[in-house]
Amino acid sequence: RLVGSEMCIRDRYLAGGMSTEQFYGIDAFQKNILNGIGTIAFPLFCLLLSEGFFYTKNRKRYIGGMLAFALISEVPFDIGFFSRYSIAEGTFPFYLQYQNVFFTLFLGLLTLVIIEKVALKISGDGRKSKVTKILCQLGVVIIMAIIAELVKCDYGSQGIVYVSMLYFLRKSRLLQSAGFLIMYMVTTGNQPTIFIVVAALIILLYNGKRGNLSIKYFFYWFYPVHISLLYGASLLFK
């Protein structure tokens, strides 16, 4: 997805005597591997996001941090994926046609906040109260999913659905894993790939224990930094 790098790499390999068929065979394999890594990583981010929301001691700070990294990551994201960053191109200060995944996760957190507020406002153990609560919470998920699509976040409504589903089913890893597979098929219309199955297995095996909090921000910073490094590497082929 790094604009321009594919053409430069292609020209280099073709000049070395590789056939077009050979190049695109390798290129497709590389793309599948990279896409596969992202396919595994995103649902795991959604899982950890929902877990973090449940266990964090300061939700405002948690949500604020997600928004901060969404803003920090947007410039590297715009430059790395669209290769243009100027007022003339309409990409300054942000390219509004597509937003990075931190915005998706931020909206996912807001969804969970509203879902919990709805649960607190609609009290009662009766059947009517439970049905009303579920319908209202489902309505919140749908509205936030629509917003994610309108804002044009990476993964869009799919991200909101994943975060919400994993939060609702957090008491059972088996239900989370099965729910993820079902939601993947519902939101994409595709059969699960090997990468989706791997992600589902990792969700199933997750023990729920908190990891080393000292490296938490390493993973936050990794996203904008690795995009910048990949874009810089793509310039070497020009």
Describe the residue ranges of each PLM region.
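Interfacial loop-to-helix transition and helix-capping segments at the boundaries
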Residues: 30-40, 86-107, 146-175, 180-198, ...
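Hydrophobic cores of alpha-helical transmembrane segments in multi-pass inner/ER membrane proteins
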Residues: 42-50, 104-116, 162, 196-204, ...
